[in-house]
Amino acid sequence: MFMGEYEHQLDAKGRMIIPSKFRYDLNERFIITRGLDKCLFGYTLEEWQQIEEKMKTLPMTKKDARKFMRMFFSGAIEVELDKQGRINIPQNLRKYASLTKECTVIGVSNRIEIWDRETWNDFYDESEESFEDIAEDLIDFDF
């Protein structure tokens, strides 16, 4: 399970260190793709296989299902950690997530998310104010 928040930098070649706490669970190779809220999602290969199976059940007669699958899968790439624990994030994904030099990597249960730091801070500030309201709106959820 992935959890926590870590600040890292993207170098001039598009490489970024993955937090050491995440590297063990991700293994050497994992998948990154376009996520929601203008961030990138990162999944283990095993989790990615489960997502692929779920996606196959989406109705291809629905225009939104086709659009979502195209965006999600066309942005997906298998990445490999180098000896320094870095991955290379392709330009198209850096552009999608508006990644600048300063990035934040967070753990969200079954995935990691890679955010531009300023975008993350804005999202966090906005969400922090409504955290309790969001929790109340989640049906059948209890700690």
UniProtKB/Swiss-Prot annotation:
Signal peptide: none annotated. Keywords: Cytoplasm, DNA-binding, Repeat, Transcription, Transcription regulation. It is found in: Cytoplasm, Nucleoid. Residues 5-47, 76-119 form the SpoVT-AbrB domain. One of its GO terms (biological process) is negative regulation of DNA-templated transcription initiation. Pfam families: MraZ (PF02381). One of its GO terms (molecular function) is DNA-binding transcription factor activity. GO terms for cellular component: cytoplasm; nucleoid. Its main location: cytoplasm. PANTHER family: TRANSCRIPTIONAL REGULATOR MRAZ (PTHR34701:SF1). HAMAP family: MraZ (MF_01008). Forms oligomers. Belongs to the MraZ family. This is Transcriptional regulator MraZ. It comes from Staphylococcus haemolyticus (strain JCSC1435).
